[in-house]
Design a protein with these regions (language model features):
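Helix-loop-helix hairpins and the membrane-proximal interhelical loops
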Residues: 1-44, 171-244
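Helix-loop-helix junctions within the multi-pass membrane cores of secondary transporters/permeases
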Residues: 2-4, 10-29, 48-129, 241-329
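Residue-level signal for transmembrane alpha-helical positions in Major Facilitator Superfamily
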Residues: 23-24, 149, 225, 267, ...
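Predominant activation on well-ordered alpha-helical scaffold segments within soluble catalytic domains
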Residues: 29-33, 57, 78-82, 138, ...
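Short polybasic/polar patches that bind polyanions
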Residues: 34, 118, 235, 258, ...
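Short coil/loop linkers at secondary-structure junctions
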Residues: 38-39, 167, 239-240, 263, ...
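Residue-level signal for pocket-adjacent positions within structured domains
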Residues: 64-66, 111, 196, 201, ...
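Membrane-embedded alpha-helical modules
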Residues: 86-192, 293-388
Length: 388
């Protein structure tokens, strides 16, 4: 088989990962920036800086470790900012970014976060990943109601390609879905224009109130709801990399770019699973190339940061969510198998899975964190009971 034939799924996995990441949460970023009082031009500059920051970090880490290390912004953190920044000046918002990213960098330097991550059993990490991805898998079929032609054709294409040419199943699904959506008039091209926007430096301001009321919660949510699931995802996918160096790189870059609107650069979870799955490459040692491709697409998204919102508006949501769900089915099934394969850990794993899948938010912290907490409590109690 020609080497180029191996590159198609790899490049596509990187593209789908970036597409899903932006489609699922770019609007939240705009809401958070608007809440801080940023202008449309400044918001576009934030998207540019975020794309470049995530692209550089993904390329550097994946190349250095020869592992699929995908970075992302903190979607839970962005959601918290969108609801917390009203009444806070733009300068104070930048101060919050610098404060939180400095704390994240400190966690990497001290090794505190790495020590916490070593306490998570592999079965619970896999269960957490399956719980996080479950909703994406359900979306692949939920859109059959209301968008039967589009989603039905994509599912049919995926099934046929999976049976005949599994390496190209997502390629075929993307193309078939794109053709059907275009023919049905669901692709609204007049909403998309290419534009280049330079990020704008914003001088920070630090106030005790904003740092304590927004900065600290944002730091905790980012670490618990984004970085922790990100490392658990890598561990569940067979890439147990040391946490501290990755936190230092991502936290350091985020701190450097904070004055330009980069509120966080974290280890990705959901989108990383696309690049870490067998669909990206049959050889686990070659899947880092999918992350390299994703890094390239991140840079493109950054260069054309002002066009991202228009692109997301041009594509039908049903097409994006069905594509993402089908791309993640293999990861979901593999994670469930790893989570439930050990009978002694099965109860703790199912508690982790169901808590995570529930989507519950407590104290502003998402369900992935609470899934690991409750599952960890069950794991400790049941282990002690068995040894008694």
């Amino acid at each position: 088989m020609r080497p180029s034939s191996h590159l198609v799924p790899v490049v596509l996995a990187g593209f789908v990962a970036v597409l899903v990441g932006y489609a699922s949460s770019a609007a939240i970023i705009w809401q958070a920036a608007a809440a801080a009082g940023a202008s449309a031009h400044q918001i576009a500059g934030w998207m540019t800086a975020l794309g470049i920051g995530m692209g550089v970090s993904t390329l550097v880490l994946s190349w250095w470790y020869k592992a699929p290390v995908l970075t992302a912004w903190s979607t839970p953190g962005a959601a918290l900012l969108a609801t917390s920044l009203h009444g806070v000046t733009l300068a104070e918002t930048i101060g919050v970014f610098i404060f939180a990213n400095a704390l994240i960098l400190l966690c990497g330097i001290t090794g505190l976060f790495a020590r916490l991550m070593t306490l998570i059993p592999h079965s619970l990490a896999a269960a957490m990943l399956a719980g996080v991805l479950l909703q994406f898998g359900l979306h692949a079929f939920a859109h059959l109601e209301g968008h039967f032609l589009l989603c039905g054709s994509m599912i049919a294409a995926w099934l046929i390609a999976k049976a005949l040419a599994p390496r190209y199943a997502i390629v075929v699904t993307l193309l078939v879905g794109g053709i059907v959506a275009w023919a049905a008039g669901d692709v609204v091209t007049d909403k998309f224009t290419l534009s280049l926007v330079m990020p704008e430096f914003i001088a920070p301001a630090f106030t005790f109130t904003s740092l304590v009321s927004i900065g600290l919660p944002f730091f905790l949510v980012t670490m618990a709801s984004q970085n922790a699931p990100g490392f658990a995802t890598m561990k569940a996918s067979g890439y147990p990399l040391a946490a501290s160096p990755l936190i230092i790189v991502t936290g350091g870059l985020a701190l450097l770019f904070s004055p330009f609107g980069v509120f966080s650069i974290c280890i990705a979870a959901i989108t990383a699973a696309i690049c870490q799955s067998p669909d990206a490459h049959a050889d686990a040692d070659k899947r880092w190339l999918a992350a390299i491709a994703a890094g390239g697409f991140y840079l493109l998204a950054g260069i054309f940061g002002g066009s991202i919102t228009g692109l997301m508006a041009a594509l039908p949501l049903s097409w994006i969510q069905t594509l993402a769900g089908l791309a993640l089915l293999g990861t979901i099934s593999g994670s469930l198998y790893q989570a439930l394969s050990h009978e002694a850990e099965r109860d703790a794993a199912i508690v982790t899975f169901l808590t995570t899948a529930s989507g519950v938010t407590i104290l502003g912290i998402g369900s992935a964190f609470w899934g690991l907490v409750l599952g960890g409590v069950c794991y400790a109690l049941f282990s002690r009971a068995r040894s008694a």
